[in-house]
Amino acid sequence: MQFDIAVIGGGPGGSSTAISAARAGLRVVLFEKGPYGRDKVCGDGLTPRAIGALNELNIDHSVAHRIDGLRMIAGKKKRELSWPTTDRFPNHGAVWPRQKFDNHLLDVAIESGADVRFNAEALPVIEDGVVVGVEVNGEVIRASLVVLATGAQGAAAKMLGAVRDPDETFGLAIRAYAPTPRHAERHLEACLSLRDEHGTPVPGYGWMFPAGDGTVNIGVGALSTMKGFKKLNLNTLLDQYASIVREPWSLGDYIDKPRAW
């Protein structure tokens, strides 16, 4: 079958593309290399811009935990900022665990008429320098347009010439979920004075993103510009940050094993 659009990648970008195209009456197929229900490691925070994009697609986000602003902490200083009220975006964000968020968008894509296929790793088919479709499990599926929504580090992106600049600054992060009685708070919290177990400042930040379901997404991220970055142990850094927020958040033990990206 010839499709109008083939989408590689079932994250928010890919599923949003499939939703829009299917609603416009186009024949759309989306390929997700993971199974249905796969999780994507993330901080789970949605900005007002993201909520605005969901509104444009008429996506119901009422199940997500509403976030009204940001609490920033640097040393002993603390400041709370509300999301601004503008004509461009709503004045609130949300926390929506990626497993639930991504699955919801894929469900909407299917309901909109897109052909969504799981456990299907697709690669672009190139003929005479033109992408004419995708190959999945040895099968060639042709499409008038192929949309790559896998990120720049995937095999498909590299086939199309995406190359990472080795001198470009990058970051690493790790997160876990933990129970807290403060899970229903409506501010994201970011600690800008992150330190390792030796007390050395780390260029990055720690976060507490309340999920509204009894848990908080706790995580830390660091930039490659820091001295000794290659020796940085993210699990140790997360534990160090957790020791600081454990008392004020009445934080319980991690529900799952911390995962990095």
Report residues per predicted region.
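Conserved Rossmann-like nucleotide-cofactor binding loop
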Residues: G13, Y36, Q153
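Predominantly flavin-linked oxidoreductase catalytic cores and closely associated redox partners
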Residues: V108-E247
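Flavin (FAD/FMN) cofactor-binding core of flavoprotein oxidoreductases
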Residues: W249-W261
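A conserved beta-strand/loop capping segment in the N-terminal third of enzymes
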Residues: I51-H104
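Beta1/beta-strand and adjacent pyrophosphate-binding region of the FAD-binding site
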Residues: M1-G13
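Conserved N-terminal glycine-rich FAD pyrophosphate-binding loop of Rossmann-like flavoproteins
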Residues: G34-L57
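Glycine-rich FAD pyrophosphate-binding loop
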Residues: A6, A22-C42
